[in-house]
């Protein structure tokens, strides 16, 4: 196999859900459809790579900072949903089921993987609550063991602030991923969200 083609296959294989076989099929499709698929795709990727930046307010990825969500006057600025990754934010947005603000952590705490609070967008949460006078923080963290540790860290960081802290209602299985949920399930979990009993007064 040509080294350039081999490198492209290897690059695709690093993407989520793509193994060597799937990557080879994708590359073959691109090579066989150079004008219609390969060149437009390469152009779009290059353009986005040059423009994409992280929102200095919420951690979203956009072509502007603050991002298009943070600057949208129709969003409810008193409501903030904390999510792990960009994919979780997109899951809420695709169904138009949420109209508040977001806070993207960029992952979850993991002692095994060496991910501490300093590597995540955690310390800005209480700062945003205070600065923007947020009234409710919705914690939409994936229900894993590491996710639970992350949730406890967030709750502890907000304990001295006058803010309601809630979580998505039951329905998301342990170990489940928010960005894989269908819109109906996610909407129900959000609508029926519950305030943490040990709230931070």
Swiss-Prot record:
Q: Cite the entry's keywords alphabetically.
A: DNA damage, DNA recombination, DNA repair, Metal-binding, Zinc, Zinc-finger
C4-type zinc finger span: 55-70
Q: Which residues form the Toprim domain?
A: 78-173
InterPro entries noted in UniProt: DNA_Rcmb_RecR (IPR000093), Rcmb_RecR (IPR023627), Rcmb_RecR_Znf (IPR015967), TOPRIM_dom (IPR006171), TOPRIM_RecR (IPR034137)
Which GO BP terms sit in this record? Answer: DNA recombination; DNA repair
Q: Which GO MF term does the entry hold, naming one?
A: DNA binding
UniProt record similarity statement: Belongs to the RecR family.
Instruction: Tell me the function of this protein.
Output: May play a role in DNA repair. It seems to be involved in an RecBC-independent recombinational process of DNA repair. It may act with RecF and RecO.
Q: What is this protein called?
A: Recombination protein RecR
Organism of this sequence: Wolbachia sp. subsp. Brugia malayi (strain TRS)
Lineage of source species: Bacteria, Pseudomonadati, Pseudomonadota, Alphaproteobacteria, Rickettsiales
Query: Encoded by which gene?
Result: recR
């Amino acid at each position: 196999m040509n080294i350039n083609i081999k490198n492209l296959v290897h690059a695709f294989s690093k993407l989520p859900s793509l193994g060597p076989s799937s990557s080879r099929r994708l590359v073959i499709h691109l090579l066989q459809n150079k004008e219609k698929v390969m060149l437009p795709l390469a152009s779009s990727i290059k353009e986005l790579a040059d423009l994409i930046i992280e929102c200095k307010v919420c951690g979203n990825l956009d072509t502007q900072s603050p991002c298009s969500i943070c600057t949208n006057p129709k969003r409810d600025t008193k409501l903030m949903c904390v999510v792990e990754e960009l994919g979780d934010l997109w899951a809420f947005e695709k169904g138009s089921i949420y109209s508040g603000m977001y806070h993207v952590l960029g992952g979850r705490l993991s002692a095994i993987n060496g991910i501490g609070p300093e590597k995540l967008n955690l310390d800005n949460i209480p700062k945003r609550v205070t600065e923007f006078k947020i009234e409710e923080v919705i914690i939409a963290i994936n229900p894993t063991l590491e996710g639970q540790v992350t949730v406890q860290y967030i709750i502890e960081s907000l304990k001295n602030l006058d803010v309601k802290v809630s979580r998505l209602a039951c329905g998301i299985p342990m170990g489940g991923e928010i960005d894989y949920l269908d819109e109906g399930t996610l909407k129900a979990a959000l609508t029926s969200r519950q305030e943490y009993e040990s709230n931070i007064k």
